[in-house]
């Protein structure tokens, strides 16, 4: 039952940066003993609001009210002293220090300038026990997993008696087991009567944890859902993007050209049986399958990331000898990999460099001098045309959201003479609005005659975007479905292991 008096309230919060209005008149309430989710596209204002709550930013207008008292935080220490803790995606801990030292950093128990280590470890042990964690407080943090680091961050908040704890995309680097443990801890914190704010783009997490959901769009408050029995995925999407769920995919029938890509009995590591399929110019073919189906392995083999062990790849009827990615690129075949952070972007380089790095070789001056004029124009063109949200072309790409990183990778391949594009989980970890933009890029590529082969474990996405769906099961093709005829039941039936295989 919702309490009558909120513990935390935002009253008319606005925040303006030079030339940018990040938040406008944000007002809503949060109650003790509840998990209150914040949702919205990237740039909707969620993180800015958390930074105001934590004392990183001062609001331009409005106020934060905690337990009936209007607060004005001059810095993060003031917010901590008021019982506010933020658990960010990038954890703020010191690897070389012990677990206990991290938990009580800034308030180490001491006497005469000497730290009382026995008391420090005892108190830290109590906080860890509170969270159900069996960790030696004297262990250097660097020896712990990311999930354990997160528990240390939460223990640090509890050591400061935080009554308001906000989590910002907390599961992005966690294993399934660590996510389950985090959810257990959050539910315990809720039982203790704390206010939990939870920011995530993963709707399954939102529905699993939340008692209320507030949606932001373009820096403005849209709506707060308080009856979780009456809210569903479609209602949240519509609130976030201002469109019905059917409009997100935007598929329309199109005509195709000649065969552009063909696989003839291709095998690669992780692909159990020879794979044969074709994609025509202007056609979008979706590869769907469960974990272990072999989708990513097939694409890596096609692109030269691993070696094709049998069969032949053809582009425009011509056999292509692909032993490494440069061979695929030279033939006009590009790949946006599943793990964009590890295999797609160069994190410590600029957006400009990440867009230009592949096509740069074609535009050098005198065979050896970088053509800065071309690079600036090319990067700026793709930043505008793909709506890449960045302060500028020189911004490090690691500082961009996942959706904008993916658009920069697409900009890289749009700088090349593309015939075929392979997209492996192109919208994983991307918010709904950015997904819509990625889909529009895919449709635009198809309209230009590019053959699109994209793999996704998101079945509604495959059914909503692809002209034809190829279903893979345990390293082989289990069947094909046309867009107009396909439904989730058919696709899942094809993707599920055969009974005899499952028993064996």
From Swiss-Prot:
GO cellular component, one term: ATP-binding cassette (ABC) transporter complex, substrate-binding subunit-containing
Top-level EC class: translocase
GO biological process, one term: L-arabinose transmembrane transport
CDD domains cross-referenced by the UniProt entry: ABC_Carb_Monos_I (cd03216), ABC_Carb_Monos_II (cd03215)
Induction trigger: Induced by arabinose. Transcription is dependent on the transcription factor AraC, the cAMP receptor protein (CRP) and cAMP.
Alphabetically ordered keywords of this record: ATP-binding, Cell inner membrane, Cell membrane, Membrane, Nucleotide-binding, Repeat, Sugar transport, Translocase, Transport
Enzyme Commission (EC) number: 7.5.2.12
The keyword Transport appears for this protein: yes
Pfam entry (one): ABC_tran
MF terms in GO: ABC-type L-arabinose transporter activity; ATP binding; ATP hydrolysis activity; L-arabinose transmembrane transporter activity
Localization, UniProt: Cell inner membrane
Binding site for ATP: 40-47
Domain ABC transporter stretches: 8-243, 256-499
Catalysed reaction, written as an equation: L-arabinose(out) + ATP + H2O = L-arabinose(in) + ADP + phosphate + H(+)
Protein topology in the membrane: Peripheral membrane protein
Gene3D superfamilies: P-loop containing nucleotide triphosphate hydrolases (3.40.50.300)
Role description: Part of the ABC transporter complex AraFGH involved in arabinose import. Responsible for energy coupling to the transport system.
Subunit relationships: The complex is composed of two ATP-binding proteins (AraG), two transmembrane proteins (AraH) and a solute-binding protein (AraF).
Family: Belongs to the ABC transporter superfamily. Arabinose importer (TC 3.A.1.2.2) family.
Protein name per UniProt: Arabinose import ATP-binding protein AraG
Primary gene name: araG
